[in-house]
């Protein structure tokens, strides 16, 4: 299974927390970008069968209909009729009957909406331009065409209360859609919040919010299938599962990453260089050891974890022999169920600490 990620960096406004490659929308710049994107795809795509496509950003829905028509002409090379899952990211206020109908007719079958919060103060803090009323109105338009809809929610804002989080989840459940991605706010250095030296909330408060989200969503029959992702059965994100299963994927566009034929690569974040055709800035040939490490780091994000037999068949190595597994099994920081090595759900919140112990045998032995 191979996926394709396409990055559209244009936005109508810049959110205070965003650390992705983005630029304000300018029509003449979009035209140049589409030319460069087409050149990159033609030059690097090797005509393999593609199972999933994800168009993200930035804000893909900031493109006008002429831009979108050009984009979809470019990506027809991926044989859109054969794509199993095709996700397109949208901002709430960009959702119109015209846009949604266009996406539906052009084989998109999954929509991801940047909601972030239903609370007015939180939306203002994040520099989001929509309201709670907008969210409900626009999701109703989407539901005329799509059943597979995700929203993103950001929690643990410095101005946010525990009750705000409860309210956000309550409102999400009212939408009656099958997927939600919940992210604790990370204050990145070069964002608006980072420049203002905003301090994050305490780990205790963060965990309390996270624990509530997990408990409430599971109570409402959502499957907690990855650290930050919850879905009704059958609505898990196949594109993202391919990432977490250490599958191969193309990354096209400004700042995109890819992993093809044992090579991980990164595209430039410099728009001027990208428009001139200097796409890749880094290519890394992955050793077997690095590949196994990636398999563990990505696979343990999933609540199902890593199948031990599949790991052996893929690498001809026992995972217990390669990594510091046994002490963590004794500490119950890892468990084995149905031949899957995984982090227990009540420990997934400290996944990064567990991964550190897995890859640092000496320190783990001292503890």
Regions found by a protein language model. Give the residues of each.
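Short amphipathic alpha-helical interaction segments
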Residues: 315-329
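Minor-groove-contacting beta-hairpin "wing" of winged helix-turn-helix DNA-binding domains
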Residues: 340-344
């Amino acid at each position: 299974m191979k996926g394709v990620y396409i990055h559209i960096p244009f936005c109508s406004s810049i959110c205070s927390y965003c650390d992705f490659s983005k630029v304000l929308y300018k029509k003449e710049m979009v035209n140049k970008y589409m030319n460069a994107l087409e050149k990159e795809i033609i030059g690097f795509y090797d005509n393999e069968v593609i199972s999933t496509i994800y168009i993200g950003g930035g804000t893909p829905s900031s493109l006008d209909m002429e831009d979108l028509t050009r984009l979809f002409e470019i990506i027809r090379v991926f044989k859109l009729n054969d794509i199993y899952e095709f996700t397109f990211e949208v901002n709430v206020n960009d959702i119109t009957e015209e846009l949604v109908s266009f996406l539906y007719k052009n084989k998109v079958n999954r929509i991801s909406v940047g909601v972030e919060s239903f609370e007015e103060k939180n939306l203002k803090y994040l520099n989001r331009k929509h309201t709670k009323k907008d969210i409900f109105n626009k999701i109703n338009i989407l539901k005329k065409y799509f059943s597979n809809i995700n929203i993103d929610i950001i929690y643990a804002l410095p101005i946010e209360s525990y009750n705000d989080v409860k309210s956000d989840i309550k409102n999400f459940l009212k939408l009656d859609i099958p997927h939600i991605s919940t992210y604790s706010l990370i204050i990145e250095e070069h964002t608006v919040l980072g420049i203002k030296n905003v301090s994050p909330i305490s780990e205790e408060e963060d965990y309390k919010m996270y624990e509530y989200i997990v408990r409430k969503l599971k109570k409402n029959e959502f499957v907690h299938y990855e650290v930050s992702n919850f879905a009704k059965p059958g609505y898990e994100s196949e594109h993202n599962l391919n990432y977490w299963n250490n599958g191969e994927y193309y990354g096209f566009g400004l700042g995109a990453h890819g992993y093809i034929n044992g090579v991980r690569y990164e595209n430039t974040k410099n728009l001027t260089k990208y428009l001139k055709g200097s796409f890749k800035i880094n290519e890394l040939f992955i050793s077997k050891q690095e590949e196994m490490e990636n398999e563990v780091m990505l696979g343990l994000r999933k609540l199902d974890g890593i199948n031990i037999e599949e790991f052996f068949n893929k690498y001809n190595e026992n995972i217990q022999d390669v990594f510091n597994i046994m002490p963590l099994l004794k500490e119950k920081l890892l468990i084995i169920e149905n031949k899957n090595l995984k982090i227990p759900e009540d420990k997934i919140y400290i996944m990064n600490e567990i991964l550190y112990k897995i890859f640092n045998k000496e320190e783990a032995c001292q503890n």
